[in-house]
Regions:
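GT-A fold catalytic core of metal-dependent nucleotide-sugar glycosyltransferases
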Residues: 62-112, 117
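N-terminal anchoring/stem segment of glycosyltransferases
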Residues: 1-49
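An acidic/histidine-cluster motif and surrounding catalytic segment
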Residues: 35, 46-63, 94
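Aromatic-acidic/polar surface patches that form glycan- and anion
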Residues: 13-20, 57-66, 112
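Structured loops at beta-to-helix junctions and adjacent beta-edge loops in soluble globular domains
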Residues: 9-12, 103-104, 120
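Short hydrophobic/aromatic-rich motifs at helix boundaries and adjacent loops
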Residues: 41-43, 117-120
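Aromatic side chains
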Residues: 7-10, 34, 39, 56, ...
Length: 120
């Protein structure tokens, strides 16, 4: 069973804009009872891997996020989501699976790939 944990990464110290805040509000609305965990410089050791250390030093936030998301899903299980993901309904029916992947709806495509990973 997939744990009721939502992981996201926010590094670099920038403030979340209104779009991000609105997207994240939908998480609380539809994912009641889920633990939401923000991974950042305070709770992830940026120096733990040479790739992350170099990416962070170069301010390549997406690369830093790529590493952290894979690490936390492997170590803790749960759900990883980018901060610009809007949730429209509960994930509870999917939690009995070993894993699943979500993708961007064609009605809302921005040209970017939406990242949603789930694992046990």
């Amino acid at each position: 069973m997939i744990p009721k944990k939502i992981h996201y990464v926010w590094v670099g110290g920038n403030e979340k804009n209104n779009t991000i805040k609105q997207c994240m509000k939908t998480w609380g609305k539809h994912l009641e009872g889920y633990e939401v965990i923000e991974w950042n410089e305070n709770n992830f050791d940026i120096d733990s891997h040479p790739f992350v250390k170099a990416a962070y030093k170069a301010k390549k936030w997406a690369y830093v996020s790529d590493y952290i998301r894979a690490y936390v899903i492997y170590k803790y299980g749960g759900i990883y989501m980018d901060t610009d993901v809007m949730v429209y309904k509960s994930f509870n029916p999917l939690l009995e699976n070993h894993a699943f992947i979500g993708r961007e709806n064609s009605m809302h495509q921005t040209g970017h790939t939406m990242e949603v990973y789930l694992a046990t």
